[in-house]
C-alpha cells in the first residue's frame, strides 16, 4: 500500500507506541511520528513492519480531543480517510473526522481490532487462552469447589462439615470434634470455600496467645491463606496508615488477650466490618448468667457485629451443660436466651436420641417410640414410613435412613453444632506403650539433695516441675555447659534404640528447646545419627526445612527432635515411633504430644517409648498417666477433669517422688473416676448429631469424587503450558516434584506467588502431605488462579493467524475460529459462577457461515496448524479484511442463539435450586427454631439478585484466529 503524509499506521513490533502518523516519505524510506510517546521511527518502504489503521462502519473511534463517534461511512481522498458518523456525547449526526485527528493513544481491545491493526499473537498463546477459558468455566461448575485445594488428607467427616457449612450464608456454628479429629482443618476448609466463592472477604481469627503461630502456619501451609498477625507493635504501626488499624489487612489473627486488654482496640475490631470471626479454644470463655468473664463479653460484643461466626471448642460433654449453652448463646442469642428452657429442651430430646440409636441398630421400636417420632417429625402421612422402618421388609433400611435424615433436619442444635467422636469415626491406629525404667545417676541424686536443701522455701508446684527435669537441676549448680548427657542413662538408651532401628523414622519430644539442641549434637557426634531439630526459636521456613528433611525417605533425617512448643500444630503421621525423653506436666499436653502421630491417616500402630528415671517425678507421672488415666494407649477426654480434682495430691507426690505412701490408692481412685466419667460420656453420646456431623456415605462419596479429581492430568498439562508461556523455568527434581524459578523474559516482571529464589511444587497430594517445603498445586492454588487471571484479564492470545496445509481444500480458503464468552456481571458474593461462569462458545466458520466446530475438535485442529510471523500475517489480514468482517457478522447471528440457550438453562437451574432451598428452609423453620430469620431473608434476596443478574447476561467476542489454507 502506498504511503501518504497524514496517514495513520501502527507498528507491528512496538504496539505500545500507539497510533503513528506518516510525516515524511522519500523514494526508499518512510518516517512515522508516534505522538503519544513523542518518538519517531524510520522504516524501509518496501518491507516495513507497520499496518495501516482503517476503521469500518459500526466501529467506535475517539478524536484527539477526547470525544467519541460511531462510524457510519468511510471516505477516501488522495490516500487519506475521513470518517463520518454520530458523536456519542452530543448525538450530532453527519460529523466528519479526518484520520489525522484520531486519538494517538489508541488501544485495540477487541480481538478483531487487534487483528486488523496487526497486533497478532503467537499461536500457542491463542491455544492457551482458549484452554484457560474452558478449564476456568469447568472448575466453577464443580460441586465441591473450594474443597480440593487444601494440603490435607481427604477425610470424609471433615469434608462433610466443610461442604455443609462452607456454602451457607454467614455460617454461625460450633465445631466441637474430639481432639485429633481436625477442628482447625475444618475451620480452614470453611474459610477457604467462603473466600474463594466471594461469600466472605474479611476474616478475623482469635486464638490463645500460644496458638497464634500455629494458626498462621496452618492457614498458609494448608490453605495458601496469608494472614497478618496483630500484636501491640503491629497495631501501633498500623495506626499511622489508617484510622482503624484493622482496615489495613483483610485476613487477621490476634490473641484473645490482645483483643480484650484495650477498650479502644475492641471497638476498632468491632467496627472493622469482618465477614467471618473464628474463635479457637472457645471453651475457655467463662460464663455464668450473673457474671460472664471479660473474655466472654469481648467475644460476645464481636459476635454481635460479625455476620459469620465459627467457634472451636472441646466436646459439649466435657464442658458441662451451662458452658455448652454459653457457646450456643454467642451464636444465636435470640434462640438461646434462657438456660432453664435449654436444659428442659435437652431433657426432652434424650428419648429421641435413644430412638435414633435403636433405628440405627436395626432394633424394633415400641408403639410409644413410634408415636414420639411421629410427633417429633410433625409431617402428614408419616405413618407408612414409620411402619416400613419398623418392618422386616427390604425397604426397612432405606426407610430408617430417611427417618434419621428427617430427624437431623429438625434436631434441636444440628444446624449450629457439629461434633465427631473417635467412636464415630474410623481410621485411627492403636497406641502401644513401652516404658523403660532407668537408674537415677549419682550426679543427679546429689544435685536433687542440694536443690532440696536450698529450695526448701519453693512451692510444691515449683519443686514438682524441677523434679520432672533432673538435668536442669544439675545444670543449675554445674552451669549451663554441664555435660549431663555424658552420664544420663536416657541418652545411652536413646542412642542404642536409634542405632538398632536405623530404618525407622522416630519423633523425639522433650519439654525444652535446649534439650533438643543438646541431644542433636550428641547423636551426631557420637553415633553419626542424622537428626533434625524443631523448636520455637526457629522461623517458619526453618521449621519447614527441618520437617521436609525428616520426611525424606532415603536421604532424610532418621530422627526429629522437637520441643514442646515448637511441635504445636505439626503432624508427622508418616512416622509411627515416638520417644518421650521427658513427660509433660498435664494430660492435655501429653495428648498433644501423641497427637503429632495419632491422626486419621496414620498407617501403622503408634509405638510410644518412655525412658524414665526412677525416684524422680517422671516415675510418678508415668504411672499416674498410664495406670490412673490410661492416657498413653487411649485418648483421655476425662484427663483434665481428674487432673483438676487431684491436683494438690498429685503435686505433692511429684515434689517428693520417694514418698509413695498412699500413691497406689490415688491411682486406684483416679482409675475408678476415669471409668465412671467415661461411661457417663458414652451414655451421653448423641448418635443423631454424630451421624449428621460425619456425613456417612455422602461424605465418603465426596472424598472419592475429590480423589478422582486429584488424578486430573489436564491440570498438569495446562500448568506446564502456562508456565512456559509466562516464562517460568521448570526443573524436574524427581519424586513428583518440580522447581519453578523466574526467567529473565517473563510475561510480567513479578508473577504473584513466585519468589525470586523460586518454589518447589507438586501435583501429588501424598507428596505434599509428606513434604512441607513443596506447594500442592491444584486448580485452586493461587499460582494457577493468578495465571488464569493474567491470561484472561488482558488480551494475551486474543488474535492470531495460522496456516492450514490441506490439499483437499483450495489454496486461499479462509476459516475464522471465534471464541465467544457468555457471561453475566454480578458482585462476587452472589456466586453467580455456580450457574453461569464465563462460558466459552467456540465456532469455526467458513465464508458461507457454516460452523464446523462440532466436526473439528480444537486440540486435533490446533496440531494441524502452522504459525505465521507477524509481518506476513499483517499482509494476509489486509488482503482478506472485508471477508473477515463478513464472517464476523455471520458469527454474531449464530452466537445470539447459542448464548440465549446457555442463559436460559442457567436461569432455570438457578430458579429451581434457589427456590427449592428457600422452600426447604421455610418448611424447616416451622419445626426447627435454629434456622435464623436473616438466613431466610438472605436466601430470598440472593435468589432475586441472581435472577436479575442472569436477565442482564450477554456475550462478547474473546478471541479469534484467522486460518488460511495453503498447499506448501
Curated annotation (Swiss-Prot):
It comes from the Bacteria. Gene3D superfamilies: 2.30.30.140, 2.30.30.930, 3.30.360.80, 6.10.140.1500, 6.10.140.2230, P-loop containing nucleotide triphosphate hydrolases (3.40.50.300), Tandem AAA-ATPase domain (3.40.50.10810). Residues 164-334 form the Helicase ATP-binding domain. Its EC number is 3.6.4.-. A motif (DEAH box) lies at residues 280-283. Keywords: Activator, ATP-binding, DNA-binding, Helicase, Hydrolase, Nucleotide-binding, Transcription, Transcription regulation. Residues 490-662 form the Helicase C-terminal domain. SMART domains: DEXDc (SM00487), HELICc (SM00490). Pfam families: Helicase_C, RapA_C, SNF2-rel_dom, Tudor_1_RapA, Tudor_RapA. ATP binds at residues 177-184. SUPFAM superfamilies: P-loop containing nucleoside triphosphate hydrolases. GO terms for molecular function: ATP binding; DNA binding; helicase activity; hydrolase activity, acting on acid anhydrides. GO terms for biological process: regulation of DNA-templated transcription. It is an enzyme of class 3 (hydrolase). Belongs to the SNF2/RAD54 helicase family. RapA subfamily. Interacts with the RNAP. Has a higher affinity for the core RNAP than for the holoenzyme. Its ATPase activity is stimulated by binding to RNAP. Transcription regulator that activates transcription by stimulating RNA polymerase (RNAP) recycling in case of stress conditions such as supercoiled DNA or high salt concentrations. Probably acts by releasing the RNAP, when it is trapped or immobilized on tightly supercoiled DNA. Does not activate transcription on linear DNA. Probably not involved in DNA repair. HAMAP family: Helicase_RapA (MF_01821). This is RNA polymerase-associated protein RapA. It comes from Shigella sonnei (strain Ss046). The lineage of its organism: Bacteria, Pseudomonadati, Pseudomonadota, Gammaproteobacteria, Enterobacterales. The gene is rapA.
